[in-house]
Amino acid sequence: MPDPQKEIAKLRAQITEHDRLYYKDAQPAIDDQAYDRLKARLAELESTHPEFDFGESPTQSVGDDRIEAFESYRHRKPMLSLDNTYSSEELIEFGQRLNKRFPDQSLTYLVEPKIDGVAVSLTYENGALVRAVSRGNGVEGDDITQNVRPIKGLPVSIADAPAVLEVRGEIYMRHEEFERINGAREAEGQPLYANPRNLAAGTIKLLDPAEARSRKLDIVLYGVGACEPGNYFSAQSEIQQKLKDWNFPVLEKYWLAEGIIKKQSPPLSLSCFKI
């Protein structure tokens, strides 16, 4: 029978190494589903064997993309990661848990596509963009303003804004730009980049802003962190509409769902589309 303590230690070491490759080197060695399986197994073992608590665990963190070359800034509100799922059954269970937590409320869900990019937090003070910060370790991240400010379509000022506003989103690279850059590198005999997400992650951490500008990045905004004064928004759908009013690049397609799907024929499928 496997030793749970040894398996926990092994999984923590494996996940920590994969976090380093993904967040700091932008060169993941395994795909997202394989990584999620490792993390799910570790979470299961930690829940079953709390006596083997060795301190910090990768199940309790969001990785860390900070590097020494950049100045770090503390997020006014932590940037947390979202749980994910690959099955409709887990999605239904999620809805059931929320129904038990809020038995007297009729819950409406906002459903939107997920862009596989690099998380970023934009800080606006009195309507002016003052800083762009990477997720980092969720508490503080790297100041990447010089590489984010030039992104086409990103407003450097917004009207009728709260005194302090953190806007959260994803920086990504379209497939056409990725293929253009890799084509040029191939012609020069240089190593090719693995995928658009890795190239976007590497681009925002370039020390030469001119080189970063030569690579076309895109950005999509979908959420709000700190907002001072508070109580500015009461629902995610309001955030979506206000971001659009402020001329932020947003996902135009999203849906409001009255409850989680309980039965569907054919079965619910989770799919993606190419950008």
Annotate each predicted stretch with a short phrase.
Residues M1-I275:
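RNA/tRNA-interacting regions in translation and RNA-turnover enzymes
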